[in-house]
């Protein structure tokens, strides 16, 4: 690691166990992970390896059974849920396999929403600008049901980057798309990531996609493996 860089995300001894009938199911075991500012990291593994659970814990969306996560220098699990949500709103963007757009809002309004919640007075102009960056300048007034899957994911990307987050979590962002649409979305993820200088943590089962990241972290049976 370059000495001038700092860890924007640090996990130590992360474990996750859940009840399964009368027994316990171990999902994650003793995960240690550091991510430096500006880095692009892929977390890869087969279905059931624990990668999506790890991402949820790293983002403070789920709580670990053991261990500690620091995001931008803050101990996530020393905060209550409201404080964690406020930290995410300030510093984190998300892109999921399901687009999670609000069906009653237009593309423009979906992207404006986090900007308005953060108090940005230029929300409409900012949202329009980033939708143009993702190739949707002619779709601003369209509702999600009138957009293709690839277009909906582009709106979700624009929304995620609209607040210029320090860290973007992407969980199987092309999982609901055909190959052509998925390739276009992934190109945009990396283009926007470079343009905004955002740190990227990408969860995927796609090895070719993972290799586009600077570093690959592999999970198997809830552990990081070589």
Question: Residue ranges of each PLM-predicted region?
Answer:
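Primarily ABC-family ATPase nucleotide-binding module
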Residues: 2-8
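Basic, Gly/Ser/Thr-rich N-terminal segments that form RNA-phosphate-binding interfaces in CRISPR RAMP
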Residues: 226
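ABC family nucleotide-binding domain
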Residues: 8-219
């Amino acid at each position: 690691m370059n000495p001038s860089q700092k860890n924007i995300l640090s996990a130590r001894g992360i474990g996750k166990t859940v009840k399964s009938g009368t027994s316990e199911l171990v999902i994650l075991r003793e995960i240690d992970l550091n991510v430096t500012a500006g880095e692009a990291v892929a977390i890869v593994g087969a279905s059931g390896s624990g990668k999506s659970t790890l991402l949820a814990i790293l983002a403070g969306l789920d709580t670990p059974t053991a261990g500690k996560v620091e995001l931008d220098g803050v101990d996530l699990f020393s905060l209550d849920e409201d404080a964690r949500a406020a930290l995410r709103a300030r510093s984190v963007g998300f892109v999921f396999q399901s687009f999670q757009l609000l069906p009653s809002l237009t593309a423009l309004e979906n992207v404006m929403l986090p900007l308005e919640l953060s108090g940005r007075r230029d929300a409409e102009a900012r949202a329009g600008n980033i939708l143009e960056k993702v190739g949707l300048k002619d779709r601003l007034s369209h509702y999600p049901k009138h957009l293709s899957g690839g277009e909906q994911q582009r709106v979700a990307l624009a929304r995620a980057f609209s607040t210029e987050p320090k860290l973007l979590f992407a969980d199987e962002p092309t999982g609901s798309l055909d190959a052509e649409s998925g390739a276009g979305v992934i190109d945009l993820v990396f283009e926007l990531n470079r343009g905004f200088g955002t740190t990227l943590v990408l969860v995927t089962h796609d090895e070719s996609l993972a290799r586009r990241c600077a570093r690959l972290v592999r999970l198997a049976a809830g552990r990081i493996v070589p």
